[in-house]
């Protein structure tokens, strides 16, 4: 062959052109699916795997909790807790949360709170902390502690500021008449003051410690506003003072509730483009309910526009996507603690300052009017 000549196909091996025998497919191996009958976990098991046995017990506890058999569920969870190896952190957290929720339903709130505090202190990521804060919220809600309920809603919102449902719950809490304080006319010694005959004046209309009052809250030692020190000598003067303060407290609560609802609506509006079916239906229905509630507050249009601007400054579509598909962030305890509001004042200064500043001249005038009336 002359140098430089090229033969077509000469660069391939002969094996390339050989026809390989066809492989006959083997018959599929038999597969026996595990059939789980209803309440299959109540059957006796011969498994030697301790974790599998404990998992079955947890299922029994979960079913008992679902049936509201809290004593039975607590027994199951407690028996698991004693046998769990110290290295099985995931199941231990689940079991502890189950114990705490059962204790809360049984009225043993202090024991439930001890577990919740322990879970919060051991949280190593945002998912753990969210579960612990939600547990605190459930306990204080059952305990009917409005101040703490609002605080832990604020903590959850600090961790997940783009969750519209938490903002809706916060608005509802601001408008709830909480039983945190006894009757306003009751003295520290348990005796009724001269204003005790005014049964319409109840502490349930005052949200102590939650920032709902534009005036100093009463001290824990006394459920009576210091109206005597303000010059409210007569019973009529005292009733006028209390009525004015009650009205101011209700107005302040309505402002914050309205701002929270407006933010929830903004978040729902951005999320609706990514939702379908029942999720979208719930979204649109909630927006309608919010619109009706905001209308009932009867705030001026410029006030509502200011609230919408203030509560929507950080809302962008990219952040909404992150909230709908969150990533579990593993951070240190110090970083987790810094990510949530330490107090209601800190939270409300961050979120409601612009709204409060808008109304501050009116509040000052209202305060002066009360002092003159006193």
From Swiss-Prot:
Pfam families: DUF5588 (PF17826). Residues 188-197 have a biased composition (Polar residues). Residues 182-201 are annotated as: Disordered. InterPro entries: DUF5588 (IPR041404), TPR-like_helical_dom_sf (IPR011990). This is Uncharacterized protein C8orf76 homolog. The lineage of its organism: Eukaryota, Metazoa, Chordata, Craniata, Vertebrata.
């Amino acid at each position: 062959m002359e140098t430089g000549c090229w033969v077509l196909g000469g660069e391939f091996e002969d094996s390339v052109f050989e026809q390989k025998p066809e492989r006959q497919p083997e018959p599929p191996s038999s597969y026996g699916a595990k059939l789980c009958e209803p309440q299959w976990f109540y059957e006796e098991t011969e498994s030697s795997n301790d974790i599998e046995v404990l998992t079955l017990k947890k299922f029994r506890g979960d079913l008992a909790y679902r049936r509201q058999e809290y004593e039975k569920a607590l027994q199951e969870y407690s028996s698991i807790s004693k046998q769990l190896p110290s290295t099985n952190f995931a199941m231990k957290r689940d079991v502890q949360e189950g114990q705490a929720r059962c204790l809360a339903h049984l009225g043993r709130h202090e024991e439930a709170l001890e577990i919740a505090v322990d879970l919060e202190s051991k949280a190593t990521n945002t998912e753990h902390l969210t579960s612990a804060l939600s547990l605190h919220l459930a306990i204080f809600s059952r305990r009917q502690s409005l101040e703490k309920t609002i605080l832990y809603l604020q903590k959850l919102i600090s961790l997940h500021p783009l969750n519209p449902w938490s903002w809706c719950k916060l608005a509802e809490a601001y408008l709830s008449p909480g039983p945190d304080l006894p009757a306003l006319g009751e003295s520290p010694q348990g005796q009724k003051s001269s204003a005790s005959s005014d049964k319409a004046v109840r502490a349930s209309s005052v949200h102590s410690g939650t920032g709902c009052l534009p005036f100093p809250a009463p001290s824990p030692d006394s459920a009576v506003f210091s109206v005597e020190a303000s010059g409210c000598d007569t019973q009529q003067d005292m009733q006028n003072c209390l009525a004015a303060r009650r009205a101011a407290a209700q107005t302040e609560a309505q402002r914050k509730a309205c701002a929270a609802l407006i933010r929830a609506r903004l978040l729902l509006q951005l999320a609706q483009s990514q939702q379908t079916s029942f999720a979208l239906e719930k979204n649109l229905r909630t927006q309608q309910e919010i619109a009706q509630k905001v209308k009932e507050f009867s705030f001026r249009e410029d006030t509502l526009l200011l609230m919408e601007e203030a509560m929507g400054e950080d809302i962008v579509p990219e952040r909404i996507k992150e909230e709908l598909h969150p990533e579990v962030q593993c951070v240190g305890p110090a970083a987790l603690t810094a990510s949530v509001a330490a107090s209601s004042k800190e939270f409300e200064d961050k979120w409601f300052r612009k709204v409060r500043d808008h109304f501050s001249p009116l509040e000052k005038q209202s305060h002066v009017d009360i002092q003159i009336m006193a």
